[in-house]
Regions:
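N-terminal Rossmann NAD(P)H-binding glycine-rich loop of SDR-like oxidoreductase domains
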Residues: 3-25
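Glycine-rich Rossmann NAD(P)(H)-binding loop
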Residues: 169, 200-208, 235-242, 253
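Conserved glycine-rich Rossmann-like NAD(P)H-binding loop of the short-chain dehydrogenase/reductase
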Residues: 26-37
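NAD(P)H-binding glycine-rich loop region in Rossmannoid oxidoreductase-like domains
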Residues: 38-95
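Mid/C-terminal beta-alpha module of Rossmann-like enzyme folds, strongest
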Residues: 217-303, 315-317, 321, 338-345
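Conserved Rossmann-fold NAD(P)-dependent oxidoreductase catalytic core, especially the SDR/UDP-sugar
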Residues: 68-72, 84-87, 91-142, 160
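Substrate-positioning beta->alpha
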Residues: 145, 177-183, 200-225, 232-233
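Conserved beta-loop-beta element that borders a ligand/cofactor-binding pocket
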Residues: 149-177
Length: 348
């Protein structure tokens, strides 16, 4: 029997590759729920609804009775302070559950995408490599409330959660993406004849980090949601290697064709304010698609992304033991994504 996945928050970082992954298997059809839907085709059906609006969710989902798997990838709008609304995020998830549960008699599994903020990575140094059973920091965190909500409501269906770190992808439609930040920043430095300085403290340059590729995350989500041993469990999902920006920065510079610079901490969100004319010149000279720098990259996100002067590393032992053994070279992944942006005429 065909599985039917409902992806709530289908415009987010984790959802695009999940849609591709599921549709590559003829045993799946996909319902993509988003505030702004796209064109439905084949086994993909787009549904419009505001997840903050419970009655609207119920109306939009009431006729879709065949859902077997719910993948919840949505997040409430938030800034880059690291703190996100517990109330808003729990309300959105509850609205989707309230709409799906009464009509989806075949519902088997609800999967929740979380992240390393579960371990308090946004608050300061934390125990690494982070393990799924590490104690929760005693602070408000919507991940805790969402997971507890699923655990309470799971009757006749199971829940699970994935915990990626920063997600990297080729996603021209999404500015909150470290790949385009790096690419645009390097291009501007090269245009101005300036060195490719690292824009964060030395502690960040030397700390151990890991990454999560969006496609690898999608495949892991499918595995977790369909593997009996993963029922009612959470799993870290990262590429499986670790790196230091000190080692990766020269590789990026070589790929872009610029000399690596020094560690020079500054706010990228402030640095970029007068760079649009420079970017316009780059666009004209390289025949790129016309764009605004703020549409290419989220510079406030960049400040948050590189700010952590401590290790951000997660253990994948539990995921591997469950049978998902894929790994990915993070350096190669980043270079490959930059190459795809160049080929798409988004970056030079």
């Amino acid at each position: 029997m065909t599985n039917t996945a409902l992806i709530a928050g289908a415009g987010g970082a984790a959802s695009k590759r999940l849609i591709e992954t599921l549709l590559a298997d003829p045993g799946w059809s996909v319902l993509a729920l988003a505030r702004t839907p796209r064109q439905s085709a084949g086994r993909l059906t787009w549904i419009a609804a505001d997840l903050f609006d419970g009655p609207a969710c119920a109306r939009a989902l009431g006729e879709h009775r065949g859902v077997t798997h719910l993948f919840y990838t949505a997040r409430a709008k938030h800034g880059e302070t690291g703190v996100e609304s517990v109330e808003d995020n729990v309300a959105m998830l509850r609205n989707v559950l309230d709409a799906v549960e009464p009509v989806a008699a075949r519902l088997e599994h609800v999967h929740l995408v979380q992240g390393t903020k579960y371990y308090g990575m946004h608050l300061g140094p934390f125990r690494t490599p982070a393990r799924e059973d590490d104690p929760r920091p005693d602070v408000p965190n919507f991940y805790y409330d969402q997971q507890d909500l699923l655990a309470r409501r799971a009757r006749g269906w199971a829940w699970s959660a994935s915990r990626p770190t920063f997600i990297y992808d080729f996603a021209p439609e999404r500015a909150r993406n470290a790949v385009t930040v790096v690419g645009a920043y390097a291009a501007i430095c090269r245009e101005l004849g300036r060195p490719f300085d690292y824009p964060a403290p030395a502690a960040s340059f030397d700390a151990l980090r890991d990454m999560t590729d969006a496609s690898l995350l999608a495949r892991a989500m499918r595995h977790i949601a369909t593997t009996p041993a993963c029922r009612n469990e959470a799993f870290n999902v990262v590429n499986g290697d670790v790196f230091r920006w000190r080692d990766l920065w020269p590789r990026i510079a070589a790929h872009v064709g610029i000399a690596p610079g020094d560690v020079r901490p500054f706010k990228m969100s402030e640095w970029v304010r007068d760079k649009q004319p420079v970017w316009d010149g780059i666009v004209r000279r390289h025949g790129l698609a016309e764009s605004r720098l703020d549409d290419i990259a989220d510079w406030a996100f960049a400040d948050f992304h590189w700010a952590h002067g401590y290790d951000v590393v997660s253990s994948t032992a539990k995921l591997r033991e469950s049978g998902f053994t894929e790994t990915l070279d993070s350096t190669k992944m980043l270079v490959d994504h930059l190459t795809r942006y160049r080929e798409a005429k988004v970056l030079p």
